[in-house]
Swiss-Prot record:
Superkingdom classification of source: Eukaryota
Coiled-coil spans in chain: none
Biological process annotations from GO: detection of chemical stimulus involved in sensory perception of bitter taste; negative regulation of proteolysis
A molecular-function term among this protein's GO annotations: cysteine-type endopeptidase inhibitor activity
Post-translational modification remark: Phosphorylated at both its N- and C-terminal regions.
Effect listed in the UniProt record for changing residue 77 to N: In a breast cancer sample; somatic mutation
Protein species of origin: Homo sapiens
Entry protein name: Cystatin-S
Gene transcribed to yield this protein: CST4
């Protein structure tokens, strides 16, 4: 009787030690949690590009806008991926009908820059090749 009890106690002590050593904050991953996204990640870049594309479709401005700076990028995985972006957007010198809009220079004159701070939420289901703009909010910077 003592031997099974000792084995059980040893197993529990080993498990407790393993849990304690892996419970550091940086090692915790909570399913459905929101985490900082890697801006170098191809999927994150696709979602950001989609957000800016949808933003440009919705604006009545003839000039194309693109990110000046990504202030924050986060992601959440559950039944797909939610991406959350906080972006400073600037007005370029290119009209929306021009090719290669991603390399357009920004307006230098302050009255033409029209900078905005925008928050975008993108939902993607990669295995269905589906992406949608869930929420978009912008204000003058």
């Amino acid at each position: 009787m003592a031997r099974p009890l000792c084995t059980l106690l040893l197993l529990m002590a080993t498990l407790a030690g393993a849990l304690a050593s892996s419970s550091k904050e940086e090692n915790r991953i909570i399913p459905g949690g929101i985490y900082d996204a890697d801006l170098n990640d191809e999927w994150v870049q696709r979602a950001l590009h989609f957000a800016i594309s949808e933003y440009n479709k919705a604006t009545e401005d003839e000039y194309y806008r693109r990110p000046l700076q990504v202030l924050r990028a986060r992601e959440q995985t559950f039944g797909g991926v939610n991406y959350f972006f906080d972006v400073e957007v600037g007005r370029t010198i290119c009209t929306k009908s021009q090719p290669n809009l991603d390399t357009c220079a920004f307006h230098e004159q302050p009255e033409l820059q029209k900078k905005q701070l925008c928050s975008f939420e993108i939902y993607e289901v990669p295995w269905e090749d589906r992406m949608s703009l869930v929420n978009s909010r912008c204000q003058e910077a």
